[in-house]
Each structure stands twice: as structure tokens, then as C-alpha cells.
Amino acid sequence: MGCTVSAEDKAAAERSKMIDKNLREDGEKAAREVKLLLLGAGESGKSTIVKQMKIIHEDGYSEEECRQYRAVVYSNTIQSIMAIVKAMGNLQIDFADPLRADDARQLFALSCTAEEQGMLPEDLSGVIRRLWADHGVQACFSRSREYQLNDSAAYYLNDLDRIAQSDYIPTQQDVLRTRVKTTGIVETHFTFKDLHFKMFDVGGQRSERKKWIHCFEGVTAIIFCVALSAYDLVLAEDEEMNRMHESMKLFDSICNNKWFTDTSIILFLNKKDLFEEKITHSPLTICFPEYTGANKYDEAASYIQSKFEDLNKRKDTKEIYTHFTCATDTKNVQFVFDAVTDVIIKNNLKDCGLF
């Protein structure tokens, strides 16, 4: 009998040891799994960050995948020149060359079929080229804060000769610059520094926020994207609302949300390149009338940073990790994401009592 008991005890001890081992392995695996939630107002650069993760942590875009973006590049280019030409009427800007009025009519006649077919035919690219070279069109482009225009407009239009080639294949940079509105939730997986990342890009959900926000209670960190350059723009869906104010409102609701009490908040003040260019001729007082500093990059950017960080109501227990980013610059995103990962590792160790 004694032998039987000791054999059973031995088996139970083995089982207990195995359970402990499995629990430890599960715990280690869970500690290595990082759920990242990408949030921010529309057109703040969230999807570009996701594309950068594919370039940096996977193998980038294959030639075939790049080809599939050709129609998007054409559509973005056509939509951009159309937006500028349409705005000329509203802003009462004339073409410098009266012949461009015919080109404008041609643009609207040809663009619909071209977009449907995902093409950029020679006659249409010629029309776009002549319009873009017109001084009146350029004058209207310089006033783009007064209407809705893609950030990538000048990038594509200045490179029309290249993208209009019959054998054109988009580059990784062309793909990064494409704009497709995100609807629903896009999930991306990758491994970095022995961590398994799951990144969720939540887009197009302005009115439904209350319904889905609690689903992300267990996320490791939130990356909140803000377009610095949007300080003098209004929303596409609400022309009364300044885009920066909308961003601040959203950040306030996320940063101080009960579901995210223990979640690291990482703030990406994005589009720093566009902001640096714009701040010299479009004053920050458009967005913040109380601002008395210089319209220079460093001072104005620091002011915006403090406006966002001041929204944190739990400063004593919650830190905001802020980075200035240019989502289309792979090296910059790589450097920043490296720093972000170190923060996540440090916080994970802290949670496990190892730091």
C-alpha cells in the first residue's frame, strides 16, 4: 500500500511540476506577446505606420504587391489635380493660360473612366502635366489649407513623368504615400526583439468609438498619431471643426479612459516634415489664438507637445511617451519604433516584478 501511495504521490508531483512548467511557459509567452493599438483622427498617418512595419519588420512589398498599388497611385494623382482645379472656382483663381480651361474640361471627362480601369492614359497624363505647370493652378495649390487635399498631391504630381510611364511599377516610397481610407480594423503581425507584435489600425470609426473601445482593454500599448501639420485645417466630415482640436479631444478621451488605466500611451506627433515647412507661413495662432511664441519649428512643436501632454489627468501615475515622427521616412520610423519597443520591454519587466 505504501508503495502505491508513493507512486501516486510521485505521479502527482510530476503532474504538478508539468503544470507549473506550462504555466511559466504560458506566462513567458504572454509577456512576449505585445498588442499595439493605433489610434488617431483621420489622415494622421496610422496606415503609413502599418506599411512601415511591413517594410522594416517583414520583407517589405514584393514587386507584385507594388504593382497592385499602381491603380491607387493613379487614383490619388487624378483626385489631387481634380481637387485643386475644383477649388480654383471656389477661391476665384483663374488659369494663367486660358487654354488650360479646355484641359480642365478634358480632365473631368477622362478621369472617371481612367479611375475605373486603374489606368493613366497618355492623353490624361498630358492634360494633368499642363494643368500642374500652370501658375494659376500652383497659386491654388499654395492655398490648399482652404480645401481638402491629399498630403501626397505634390509628391505624385511632381513625379508625373515617372508614374505615367507604361511600364511603371510603384516604389516602396510610392506605396507609403498612397492614401486609402481605412474602414474597420486592420491587423498586422510581426516579430521584433523577441516580441510578437499584433498591431491594430482602427480607422473610419468616429461615431462608433463608444461601442468598440472596451474591446481593447487588454492592449499593451496605444500609439496615438497626431498630424502636426493639421493645425490650420478643418475636418473633411465637419468643416467647423479644426483638425488639431479634434485630435486633442480624441486624445483626451483615450488617455483618460478607464479601460486604459494600465496601458502605456505613446504619442506620435507625426508629419513633422510638413509642419516644419508650413509653420513659416501659416501661424500657429490659427489653432491656438493664445500662442505668443515664434512661428518656428522647435518652439511651435514643443507648444503642441505640451498641449497634448497637459491633457493627461493622471500625471503622477501615467507617463506619456512622445516622439516626433515622419511616417513616410523609414529610417525615422525605425529609430522611433526601436525606442518604443524598449519602453514596452521595460514596462513588461516592471509588470513581472523584474525591473
UniProtKB/Swiss-Prot annotation:
Binding locations of GTP: 40-47, 176-182, 201-205, 270-273, 327
Residue segments, region G1 motif: 35-48
Chain residues carrying a lipid of type S-palmitoyl cysteine: 3
Region (G3 motif): 197-206
Region called G2 motif, residue ranges: 174-182
List of residues binding Mg(2+): 47, 182
First and last residue of the signal peptide: none
A Gene Ontology BP annotation from the UniProt entry: cell population proliferation
G-alpha domain residues: 32-355
Region (G4 motif): 266-273
Location, primary (coarse class): cytoplasm
Keywords: Cell cycle, Cell division, Cell membrane, Cytoplasm, Cytoskeleton, GTP-binding, Lipoprotein, Magnesium, Membrane, Metal-binding, Myristate, Nucleotide-binding, Palmitate, Transducer
GO molecular function: G protein-coupled receptor binding; G-protein beta/gamma-subunit complex binding; GTP binding; GTPase activity; metal ion binding
Localization of this protein: Cytoplasm; Cytoplasm, Cytoskeleton, Microtubule organizing center, Centrosome; Cell membrane; Membrane
Topology in membrane: Lipid-anchor
Residue positions bearing lipid (N-myristoyl glycine): 2
Tissue: Ubiquitously expressed. Most abundant in the lung and in the spleen.
A GO cellular-component term linked to this record: nucleoplasm
Pfam families: G-alpha
Region entry G5 motif, spans: 325-330
InterPro entries for the chain: Gprotein_alpha_I, Gprotein_alpha_su, GproteinA_insert, P-loop_NTPase
Family: Belongs to the G-alpha family. G(i/o/t/z) subfamily.
UniProt function note: Guanine nucleotide-binding proteins (G proteins) are involved as modulators or transducers in various transmembrane signaling systems. The G(i) proteins are involved in hormonal regulation of adenylate cyclase: they inhibit the cyclase in response to beta-adrenergic stimuli. May play a role in cell division.
Record-linked PANTHER family: GTP-BINDING PROTEIN ALPHA SUBUNIT, GUANINE NUCLEOTIDE-BINDING PROTEIN G(I) SUBUNIT ALPHA-2
Subunit structure: G proteins are composed of 3 units; alpha, beta and gamma. The alpha chain contains the guanine nucleotide binding site. In this context, interacts with GNB2. Interacts with UNC5B. Interacts with GPSM1. Interacts with RGS12 and RGS14. Interacts (inactive GDP-bound form) with NUCB1 (via GBA motif); the interaction leads to activation of GNAI3. Interacts (inactive GDP-bound form) with CCDC88C/DAPLE (via GBA motif). Interacts (inactive GDP-bound form) with CCDC8A/GIV (via GBA motif).
Name this polypeptide is given: Guanine nucleotide-binding protein G(i) subunit alpha-2
